[in-house]
Amino acid sequence: MMSVEAIGCEGRKSPKHRVKEMDLATAIEETTVALNLFLNNKFSEARAIFEPWSHASIYHALGHGTISYLQAVMTFDPTDIQEAIKWIKNSIEVANRFRKKTSVMTSMSKMMWKTNYNTYTDEEVHAELCYAESLLERAILSFIQDDNLINFIKGGLKIRNGYHSYKSCVQMFENRTWPSARSKQQFESGVKFGSGTFNLCISMLPKRILKLLEFVGFSGNRIKGLTDLERASKLPCLRSPMCSMVIISYHSIGTYVFGTADGDIELARQILEPCLKNYPKGVIFLFLAARIEEISGNLDEAIDKFQECIASQQEWRQFHHLCYWELMWCHAYKLDWPMAAQYANKLCEESRWSKAIYHHQQASFLAMHLPRTDACIQNINDIYAKVPELKQRIAGKSIPMEKFAVNKAKKHLIHGTENSLVGLELIYIWNGFSILAKKKELLEPVLLLTEATLQQLKKTKGSASRSSGCYWDDYSLAMLLKGITLRYLSRPSQAELCFQEVISNERDLHYDHYLVPYATLELGLLYLQYDRLQEAKTFLTQCRHHNKKYMLENRLHFKMHAALDNLKTKMTQSSEIPAQDSLNLEGEDEERTGPEEDGLEMSIASEASQDSLDKDGPIDGPGTNLKNKDQDSLTGDGSVDGPMNKVGPTEDEIARTNDKEDQDLSSGPR
């Protein structure tokens, strides 16, 4: 029984809220009711259930922390994040009070004998579960506060504590005699929810982050995570809608932001369907429904659903900003630059997340709209001029995307935006081309725009010096964007030439040095797409070891990590790879030993096996080049040179390739 006096939200004992004992089953039932209210947009009513018990009941404390956490991760609003951290810390403290107390002698005995979990009460095992879940939420908040290295390490350290708590929960679930089948089912749901979310989060982190956390002793298994979450989503338990939410978010958002956009859209639709029946006006599931339409390339349907999402509630105003953000991109994908700029302006006026980023986006979208009058150009410059002074510092650190916005704004103020595809550049760095790729009719106008811009740039080439100005920056950006568009249009040879030309321009770039490692990444992704696996491995690892600092490096590493995982799977499945060979995809110069963990398994063989960190054997793949012999395969002699050794194609080579390949698109003005 939980027999602690309830304490008011300010931390004082409140006579008004003095309550009697509450049993675990009632606490879970009330938390389920409150969560359902929250998911049906009754936010104040949900908090009214949680608050009187938030300092006394493990599930009320967890529930209050969880709805605050959901508001934070859905909006990224700094105030919401701080509020969520406050309530999650409270949840950790409350759960810790109800956990099984261990003495020094008990701790020593664990080293010699297995723990007898039958001595734990139901409250104590559920307190351990709530403690682990709160630590996981706190860790994820560390990641979303800022994507710099320090926050990743802090988040990893917090996950470490939650990881060990989840290990204990797995043992409790398997080795305890449960007096109540319902309590056991609720516990199983919680373990699978935490295990699945944990594995998904860790599986998306780049290796460079995991290596710095080597002493933590864990790794993530994506397949295991998704399996656990899908199983738990089907249980009639408190955490079922949360499991569904994580799965849908992973496939519709996570894989697009942190990976290579390989989410299972149909699975997301299937899991979303019963959620929409249970919460037909629930803002979170309406948003996810709109997001699924967006990533499917159904932009008009997505716009309608985001508008429906906004109209569904007025209490949680910050959630409107998230919808404005997606509406801005939907219009940008349609090349409707005035509407995209309009939504960017709404974010400038209403949202507090990053006004520097919003202003940069607004000016960049306006710069894409033609024709531009002198007054329009002056307005664009005025907006760009505000960006540097709006940059924030959080804990002494700048937000990487804000640094990018500031650097680009300064460049455009000096050199202007004529013939600079600033709007398409934003679509690319925010991973929008994977959405454009879903519909050919979305890609064709982009190809025409890039080719027209390249033609205009070539007209100014004679007056531009290779040692000054930003001609080569603008030219290389347009060439990179053209290559990406061609890759998605299944014209690989042309795309390959575009990426190689960007790489060959490295010494001529003055501002946008990030273009070369990103072109290297895109070349690796192209080879991966067409099963030229050895070349894919070479270029994916080369972009990891790029010898210069550049903007948006962390974003590249997330995409590269996801691509290397896909490459590893393909190479393992390839008949040309001997079964006994293992793969070193992180570079042959690294010596890595020890077993690889399989993620957080429901059965944990031994403590020792959990203390190693995702370590592949130092064995290279075979040295032969893998080629696709089909008609649509990439051309070339199979040689694999580094970016610094590549010689870019000439304009004649590109022209000959253009004539040779598909002629279903107009090539734009010549």
Language model region names:
Residues 1-59, 74, 273-283, 288-291, ...:
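Eukaryotic intrinsically disordered, low-complexity segments enriched for acidic and Ser/Thr/Pro residues
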Residues 48, 98, 105-108, 144-146, ...:
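Generic marker of "main functional regions" within proteins
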Residues 580, 585-667:
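Long, intrinsically disordered, low-complexity tracts enriched in Ser/Thr with interspersed Pro
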Residues 16-30, 37-45, 63-274, 295, ...:
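Short coil/linker segments at helix-helix boundaries
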